[in-house]
Amino acid sequence: MLEKIGIMQGRLVPREIKSRIQSFPWTNWKKEIRLAKKYEIKYIEWTLDYKNFLSNPLIQKPLLVKKILKKNNIKLNSITADFFMQKPAWIKQKQKTNIFLIKLLNICNLLNIEFIVIPLVDNSSIKKGNKKKIINYFNLLKKNNHLKKTKILFEVDLPPKKVNSFIGYLDKSFGINYDTGNSAFFGYNFNDEKHYFKRVLNIHIKDRKKGGQTKTLGKGDVDFKLFIKYLLKIKYRNNLILQTYMPKNDNKVTYETLKNLNFIKKTIHEK
């Protein structure tokens, strides 16, 4: 059964940066954890930006974060490292990003956090011809024993066959974070994507039309019934994290997320 259903941080409280659909909720991160408990959401995926990275409570006071999560019965076993997308470590003069990632890996080891999601999209896209640099960078990270028990998962914008090729250069300390909405955006065939699903260890749930923006679940091109049926078939047991549409109207944010949560639970139940 698919039981590890959670939300990306910032999905129960108003956007603090109106121009961005995702950023760390500095003002309301504690409130959001309390709301997650109220609505019986068991998992939250933390998000870390490059700006003010060292001030983020997970970095500055990890044991306090652990205490607050435990008090509210919320599990944190995945983190999205948006800072890596914003300032890729393999680009010249981006040594801070490397330092940040190693610091984050140490905290993950301290708190027993399983996964760090590295978005290889936009500024950090493999399409920019950085494939060899990226592979060498992460293999060196593993060789220098920075990973320990934490696995690094890549969210990529490559066609399915190229995803298989890319992840094949890295061992089982690395995997794939699959994003339903991004797949729909690029118009990829899910049957082709199944070939690398043995390496998928975390899933971001969202809906989009081909070439379009994020929408309420069920309003885009993702066939969620087919998708959930496949996950049940392969006995997928890891996270399903809602990275769903965020309304600009602050009063509708929580309602939208709960509606999407009910949609995905209903789809699972119907199978």
Can you name each region flagged by the protein language model?
Residues 25-34, 68-72, 86-175, 185, ...:
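Active-site acidic/histidine proton-transfer and metal-coordination neighborhood
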Residues 19, 43, 79, 138-221:
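Acidic/histidine-rich catalytic cores of soluble enzymes
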Residues 1-102, 109, 164, 265-271:
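N-terminal pre-domain/capping segments
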Residues 36, 44, 69, 108, ...:
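Conserved, mostly hydrophobic/aromatic
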Residues 12-27, 55, 91-92, 182-237, ...:
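Gly/Pro-rich active-site loop or hairpin
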